[in-house]
Amino acid sequence: MNDFERFLNPERKPNIKFVLSDEFVDENGKPLVWEMRQLSAAEGLEIERLNADRGDAEVLIALAASSLVVPDLSDQKLLEALSEKSKTTVLSPAQAAKAMLTMAELFKLMKVYHSFCKMGESVDELIAKAKN
């Protein structure tokens, strides 16, 4: 494979599975497993554009919520059920996350997203990786 092909076919990291909270459980009381994927640059930029006037925290919430595979916070049935339960209109993954999570759970979700996407890597860390 030449260099050109390597740039066209990057080896993306697999989705991660994690337990967000022991308050979301199955019928046996076992904590539910959540799954997160990487967003494409186009997805991330669109989410950022749509939330730019809402502040950094809202952008991060929207990114983290949109990256979830399980549960799918864009599922129309889930959004309708959350709207009915919360007596407010829930239209987006970010609104769904805020409707169903506690503040501690929301912070943990943002932390998982931040860590998974390696958003905290410094330029020095990236340069060190390139040298190895």
Could you say what each language-model-derived stretch is?
Residues 1-13, 123-132:
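Low-complexity intrinsically disordered segments
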Residues 8-25:
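Short acidic, Pro/Gly- and aromatic-enriched capping/linker segments at domain boundaries
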Residues 27-132:
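Short, surface-exposed, charged amphipathic helix/loop patches that serve as local interaction elements
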